[in-house]
Amino acid sequence: MKKIDVKILDRRICDRFPLPAYATTGSAGLDLRACIDEPMVLAPGETTLIPTGLAIHIADANLAAVILPRSGLGHKHGIVLGNLVGLIDSDYQGPLMVSVWNRGQDIFTIEPGERMAQMVFVPVVQAEFNLVESFDTSERGEGGFGHSGRQ
């Protein structure tokens, strides 16, 4: 199994907040915590950047990381990522910040150390483009939206 070296920039990680960890052996994502000293209030419709205390340099062009929302925060409180999904390219070097958006109707308070998002490492395949006159015929053809029905 491939391992990625994630640097810890902030002593609060380990001292005050636990290291990111996979919750179960089957977990794909690591939880990212709000590395802040005091609670932050997020009004309805407001966005803010939350530091995670982590820095990353994947350094392997075959890998990237995606930052995803935590389902409970979005469903129960309307707290989602400001950019919906974050993408970290392999050649990025620097701190991880999470853009958080309160799309709910109520004020939401982000507590120090609260799990705000999750990070998943994914394989990368880059496309090569070829100009062609037509595609090879397939059984599906141009069947698009709803082509297979509802039942």
Swiss-Prot record:
Similarity comment: Belongs to the dUTPase family.
Pathway: Pyrimidine metabolism; dUMP biosynthesis; dUMP from dCTP (dUTP route): step 2/2
Stated role: This enzyme is involved in nucleotide metabolism: it produces dUMP, the immediate precursor of thymidine nucleotides and it decreases the intracellular concentration of dUTP so that uracil cannot be incorporated into DNA.
Keywords: Hydrolase, Magnesium, Metal-binding, Nucleotide metabolism
CDD domains, sorted: trimeric_dUTPase
Cofactor needs: Mg(2+)
InterPro entries documented for this protein: dUTPase (IPR008181), dUTPase-like (IPR029054), dUTPase-like_sf (IPR036157), dUTPase_trimeric (IPR033704)
Gene that this polypeptide is encoded by: dut
Enzyme class: hydrolase
Binding site residues for substrate: R70, S71, G72, N83, L87, I88, D89, M97
Superkingdom in the source lineage: Bacteria
Source organism: Sodalis glossinidius (strain morsitans)
GO biological process, one term: dUMP biosynthetic process
Protein name: Deoxyuridine 5'-triphosphate nucleotidohydrolase
Classification lineage: Bacteria, Pseudomonadati, Pseudomonadota, Gammaproteobacteria, Enterobacterales
Catalytic activity: dUTP + H2O = dUMP + diphosphate + H(+)
PANTHER family the record matches: DEOXYURIDINE 5'-TRIPHOSPHATE NUCLEOTIDOHYDROLASE
This enzyme's EC code(s): 3.6.1.23
A Pfam family this chain is assigned to: dUTPase
A GO molecular function held by the record: magnesium ion binding
